[in-house]
Design a protein with these regions (language model features):
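Von Willebrand factor
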Residues: 465-582, 614-627, 649-653, ...
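Bilobed periplasmic-binding protein/Venus flytrap-like ligand-binding cleft at the lobe interface
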Residues: 225-238, 254-261, 273, 382-420, ...
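VWA/integrin I-like adhesion module and closely mimicked acidic/polar interface patches used
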Residues: 355-364, 585-644, 648-656
Length: 660
């Protein structure tokens, strides 16, 4: 229910329908009614696309039906009745206080406050830092400078649990501001002692929605009548949905998700899947997560996932590339993201790496945010001053002052300007228009508690879509180049791959191949560990990895063409089939001619439309052929990763394998 001030309280009840208050019926009956309406809608769509002579009639019937539904909605909402009383426990709207900067900045040296955000809310946090730094501040007689930094939420949670061992004390964050409190829960569950027990301070919200290109949402009526999460997962598993709707050119239903191990939208997708399987999103418990029947249904949901990505920006960048070369539907049908990401996409802002943002003309096919009928989670962007031994009293006080500023009239204006809802649930009017957001959506749900968060995190490796992955490593002579006193490119690559292997579990099929060109023109050594269940072949894989040696030149095009085709031969819709390519140079085959780049890319494109093999590319070192590696990944709908600074290989490869 919307309050008089426009605030929508977080809902904790079970699913609500699309209009007004529901009639008193048992949930199964309501679901059955929805199912029948959906079937009727799809039949109308199919008839409209197949029988031209009935188009006008069907349109008229649809119009009349819409009017009837609208009238029913008005009646159920009590349009003619007195306004309903507000919910008794709904909070009063917040009257945001004015900022209170110091009259004169404190003395130097300034207290430096490092604020670690997620990738998703980094722009908002940077804007808040700029606003705070623009006015004089004085804490304990010292000036203050806020430095925003970012990391993926799951990575930050794990690092915090370990005490940020890879950062010097002066580089560790004073304030942590992930985009959802689930990461605070996860860090605590993993042993973090620096997360204070007090309730964190939310600085703004963004709902996690199902976003679809407008034409696709309209074709199945979801822009008008939002589906339940079960209907979303059912649609994703329906191979003929688009053909039945008159659009066979859109192929299968492609559902995009971020990895729940690192991104909030991925977490929300998993909570929705477990909740839908258990019968209710707001009744999910650690016990229901552990239920074999529930886990089995979630595992079935995950089969419809094309692959996972680390951030929403990764998916949306690919969607924009697909639209520019044809249609966004070639890459995705729907993706689970936050509202702010929809706003960015619709105004022409994309990011290939989640950090560097580019602005181009807005897309022709705008995304439509859909708020599922049985509820959606809300990212609350909580801020906490960390209680680590690296945070002194002055830094803690300055961090608390920054959090105070975020809740002021000036800070909340920045929150709205940055594409988020303020603490009263209000959006900037321009954001609402561009992103097509619902100003006051019904069905908002808080994220689950720590026990559920930890249970879902632990369950994900067992329910995720299984992977079939071939690591393909360039072992040309340049891989012997040193990157430190104790490591060469090749030895560092071996260590990074061995660490990345920990991501895979029994049931994943993983193999290893390498390529160089020998003096006789042969590509060697080729496959050294067949693609097989890593649960039983891990030791053999590691042995083959340790035995790799550099040799000859770089048959890059031949290697990609050969091993992508090999992976395609065993493609299955029940697995994420991929090649992970690591290369430090350019195609160089002086001893024998091989396939050229144009033919290789054409072959990859052909595979992508039949037996899609994702070729993730990783540029390793300053001499890597970045442009070619980017074109390879783009041709297959996969992602390019940058390790041109070879010392960052472990982190980059660790990021890459979250795609599986």
């Amino acid at each position: 229910m919307t309050e008089p001030d426009g605030h929508v309280p977080v809902r904790r009840s079970t699913a609500q329908p699309f209009f007004g208050d529901p009639p008193v019926v048992a949930p199964p009956s309501a679901m059955e009614q929805r199912r029948l309406r959906r079937i009727a809608r799809r039949r109308r769509i199919l008839l409209g696309t197949s029988i031209a002579g009935i188009v006008v009639l069907v349109g008229a019937i649809g119009t009349v039906s819409s009017l009837i539904v609208a009238n029913m909605a008005a009646a159920e909402q009590g349009t003619e009745a007195e306004p309903q009383a507000p919910v008794e426990d709904a909070p009063e709207p917040i009257a945001f206080p004015e900022d209170t900067p110091a009259a004169v900045a404190g003395a130097e040296p300034c207290i430096r406050v490092s604020v670690m955000s997620s990738f998703e809310n980094a722009e908002m946090v940077a804007n808040l830092a700029a606003g705070y730094n623009a006015r004089p501040r004085s804490i304990n007689g010292s000036c203050v400078v806020v430095d925003p930094v970012r990391d993926k939420s799951g990575v930050a949670a794990e690092a915090l649990a370990a005490g940020f061992p890879d950062l010097a004390p002066e580089q560790r964050p004073t304030v942590w501001l992930p985009d959802a409190r689930t990461w605070l829960s996860l860090a605590t569950a993993q042993g973090a002692t620096a997360v204070p027990p007090a309730e964190p301070t939310s600085i703004g919200t963004s709902s996690i929605v199902l976003a679809m290109p407008g034409p696709l949402a309209h074709a199945i009526g979801w822009d008008d009548e939002p589906p339940t999460w079960n209907e979303v997962f059912d649609a994703a598993g329906d191979a003929t949905l688009w053909a039945d709707a008159g659009h066979p050119e859109w192929g299968g239903f492609k559902l995009g998700k971020t990895s729940p191990l690192v991104a909030t939208s991925g977490e929300a997708a998993m909570f929705a899947s477990f909740g839908a399987a258990a019968g209710s999103l707001d009744a999910i418990t650690a016990a229901s997560v552990a239920d074999p029947g529930v886990a089995g249904q979630v595992r079935q949901h995950e089969l419809a996932t094309s692959h996972y990505m680390a951030t929403p920006e990764h998916f949306l960048w690919h969607a924009r590339q697909a639209e520019q070369s044809g249609s966004a539907a070639d890459f995705l049908s729907a993706v689970i993201v936050d509202e702010k990401s929809v706003w960015d996409y619709n105004r022409g802002i994309t990011s290939r790496d989640g950090v560097t943002r580019t602005t181009v003309e807005p897309p022709a096919e705008k995304l439509v945010p859909i708020y599922p009928a049985d509820g959606f989670y809300v990212a609350d962007n909580p801020a906490v001053v960390l209680a680590g031994d690296w945070v002194d009293a002055g830094e803690a006080a300055a961090g608390a002052d920054f959090i105070r500023y975020a809740g002021t009239k000036q800070g909340q204006q920045i929150v709205r300007d940055s594409g988020y809802r303020d603490l009263n649930g209000a959006l900037d009017a321009g954001v609402t228009s561009v992103a097509k957001l619902t100003p006051h959506p019904e069905g908002a749900l808080p994220f689950p508690g720590q026990d559920v968060v930890a249970a879902v995190n632990d369950a994900f490796p067992e329910v995720r879509k299984r992977a079939q992955v071939l690591f393909l490593v360039d072992v040309s002579g340049s891989m012997d180049e040193p990157i430190s006193e104790s490591e060469t490119k090749l030895s560092a690559a071996k260590d990074a791959i061995a660490m990345a292997l920990d991501h895979f579990t029994a049931g994943d099929r993983v193999g290893l191949a390498a390529f160089g060109q020998a003096d006789d023109g042969a590509m060697v050594p080729g496959e050294v560990a067949p693609v097989a269940d890593i649960g039983t072949t891990r030791d053999a894989f590691l042995g083959a990895l340790g035995g790799l040696q550099s040799i000859g030149d770089t048959p890059l095009y031949q290697a990609v063409d050969t091993f992508a085709a090999q992976q395609a031969q065993s493609w299955s819709p029940d697995r994420i089939t991929a090649v992970v390519l690591l290369s430090d140079g350019r195609n160089d085959t002086p001893n024998a001619p091989t396939i050229d780049a144009e033919e290789m890319l054409a072959n990859l494109g052909h595979l992508h439309h039949g037996t899609p093999v994702l070729v993730f590319t990783l540029a390793y070192g300053a001499d890597a052929d970045v442009a070619t590696l980017q074109s390879i990944s783009s041709a297959t709908g996969a992602h390019y990763y940058d390790a041109t600074d070879p010392t960052k290989l472990r982190a980059v490869l660790g990021d890459l394998v979250t795609s599986f």
